[in-house]
Amino acid sequence: MKRGTNTPKPHIVLCAPKKTGKTTLIERIMQETKAGAPSIPIYGFQTKRFACADGIKRIYMFPAGLSQNDEGSPDARYLGSTCGRVRDVCTATFETYGTALIRSARPGGLIIMDEIGHMEKDARLFLQAIFDALDGDIPVLASVRYTDGSIDYLERIKNHPWVQLYMLTEENRDAVYAEIRNAIFSDRKEGRDHEPL
């Protein structure tokens, strides 16, 4: 779709170090999408780490907006594990499950991607689905891993021409939340729920 130079950027990406509140902010937004009238359909994915007794953290992917309290949930898919560093990666989960969760999005909805990091570096179909979403009109709210700029696809996401990038800190997260909330819900109140943000 051709966009004019004055068109607001339709997608929002959060970048911050761990424990800064990226996921908490995204979950607050999702809660409001469910409470709205009408509610906004949620698509995409979220990831969660589960700490094990052996010190290993196992990472699972879930459909965005669903409960992530149980790694044994039928909606959970194993992504890999870490123990100070990445131990293993299940690229097939990104390529099949993750790609399907992104491509299932329909107009009028919101695509959540929380979070995009370095484990998916070999998942070409998954990364293509991400960039296709960023090239599209269905609004995206994503978080990306904070890095030193050495991971090419993360830099491409942050610098995508239709992305509004927020570098989140403990000091600015309330202000950022207010801006994002306004961007997502202002068009809905004006009856433009099938347009980009």
Predicted regions and their residues:
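Hydrophobic positions on the alpha1 helix immediately C-terminal to the Walker A/P-loop
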Residues: 25, 29
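The conserved Walker
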Residues: 18
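Phosphate-binding/switch loop-helix module in NTP-utilizing enzymes
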Residues: 81-131
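N-terminal phosphate/diphosphate-binding loop that engages ATP/GTP or pyrophosphate donors
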Residues: 30-84
